[in-house]
Regions:
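Active-site pocket-lining/capping segments in soluble small-molecule metabolic enzymes
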Residues: 1-155
Length: 155
């Protein structure tokens, strides 16, 4: 999924995929009070963990062309997305001017509020850098630096 907001190597991803597939049944069931099955929402409560959003496996609309010739169809997560047309339009156009978090599913806008992740502030070489890095995220800090430049605080 090009716009999956799941954390890299998320241990709950299969569970979440099944949860989304059965969203209607789950929403109608009496669940454990205050239980949140999403590790990511708990992680993003602490701003120091926000760079993880840039370390996840989604692909920006602007970077999809790097996969040309590797597959014929790109799958987008829109089943429970609040604005599926926004997602489809951005990926069909190959560009998006706005809060990158609005394209992801789940949409993490509320977790990052009052900030937005301005997609136009992500550097052009971002894809090449993160797709070829050694994933030493604890010491590299590239994603943290990009995030600080791309975050815009809204009033």
């Amino acid at each position: 999924l090009a716009n999956s907001g799941c954390l890299r190597y998320c241990p709950s991803q299969t569970f979440h995929d099944n949860l989304v597939a059965h969203d209607e049944e789950v929403a109608g069931a009496d669940n454990v009070k205050d239980w949140n099955p999403h590790l990511c929402w708990s992680l993003y409560r602490d701003r120091k963990n926000w760079p993880a959003i840039l370390q996840a496996s989604w692909v920006r609309p602007e970077d999809l062309h790097h996969y040309d010739g590797l597959f014929k169809v790109v799958k987008l997560a829109t089943r429970v997305h609040e604005h599926p047309r926004l997602v489809l339009h951005a990926y069909a156009q190959g560009k998006y001017r706005g809060n990158l978090l609005d394209l992801l599913e789940p949409g993490f806008g509320p977790a990052f509020a009052p900030c937005v992740l301005d997609n136009t502030r992500i550097p052009a070489g971002f894809f090449r850098r993160v797709s070829s890095c050694n994933a030493e995220c604890g010491s590299c800090r590239y994603c943290a630096r990009v995030l600080e430049k791309a975050l815009v605080r809204c009033a």
